[in-house]
Amino acid sequence: MANIPDAAVPDTGTIAGRLDRLPITRTHRRATVAVGLGLFFDFYEVFLTGVLSSVLVEEFSLTKAELPPLLASTFVGMFFGALLLGRLADRFGRRGAFLLNLGLYSLFSLLGAFSGSALMLLVTRFFAGIGLGAEPPLADTYLTDLLPARKRGRFIAWAYTLAFCGFPVVGFLARGLTEHEILGIAGWRWLFVLGALGAGAVFLLRRGLPESPRWLESVGRTEEAEHLVAGLEAEARGGVDENPAPPRGTTRKRAAAPVRELFGPALRRRTWMMVVFQILQTLGYYGFGTLVPLVLAAKGYAVSQSLLFAALTYLGYPVGSALSLPLVERVERKYLVVGSVLAMAVFGIAFGYSGSMALILVFGFLYTATSNVFSNAYHIYQAEIFPTALRSTASSGTYSLSRLASGAMPFVLVPLLNSSGPTTLFLVVAAALVVVAVDIAVLGPRTTGRRLESVNDEVAQPLR
């Protein structure tokens, strides 16, 4: 008889226990790729408007007062999308919310490609943002639910490593297409078309993903959860029946946990920690990526040069994400978040002071690389610290505040850049990042290598 790893043997324990005992299967890998590709187009889209900011100023003859609303429109849409779709994922399932958000984004990104005015582009960016808003927290929640504890961090980091390739891709595509017309259509419009078509392809890929067994169990659909876990166990043993027909029996459904539990005695410390974290971290993470072409223009570089430099610094995003792979399971994620965000503050100040092309590229690359060690660690971390019944609501709800802060960011940082220059801009950003580090260091629990139920048992009593 073939030797079967202990992790592959069906467990008679809970659904969560059996999921955590599984080895990595083909379904886990397929889910990681499908989630990573969806995130790829999320980040592609988020940075697209910022990368094109200098191009759109010329295309639509935008004034300094008209540019910030256009930059903010996607983020404001993402705020509403994260709130609405994140809650839907806890009430009606992760998979359906996944499909809805990609469908909305793909449709409105395609419509945005045919914008005849800045107003139409602003409106389509807003609705595309609604579709995109919940993508990262939904991705974090879904993979956190599905993956076994000992591999959770590494595979979520792999998904984000794939996703972060979207940053240099959009940078180099913008550099290559914006100065040309293809089939009589301006190159910048093709960037929106490519994003829409790519997201549509990922939509089709995600239709084959299973629902989260942890979520099914949390709402009382235990027979369906049992069926999915049994399929994963059979797959782990080399069985061929990976997706048999679900059972027809009825199950008792439970209502989703009320949102007020997030501010109850059990969870309010973690909730408020993430509120502060999400509002301030976006100044450092998206503030750099969105505004770097404008920062380079303020340093005296032409539009074409600033797009090239931005694309080169964006290479740090996938590199940093890849560097995080051996770290997220070996270093306590709480301290990895703290250390990397402090490094971002240092490199950001150095970038602001840089006056030569070489220093701009070096510190820009170091900043983006470090920021994705930070990003991977926190995306894993934020989903681990809330119980299954509220995981998507909590992750998406607090994440939505980062989108709202990103929407306000152009109205604060662009005038600051124009009035005080890049150095002052990055000093302000660094101060925000130091507060983020203190917030997590003081209030955050440890999570690395722990089962989700263990991380949340210490606060779960009032939820039972």
Residue ranges and their predicted role:
Residues 1-464:
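Transmembrane-helix signature of 12-pass secondary carriers
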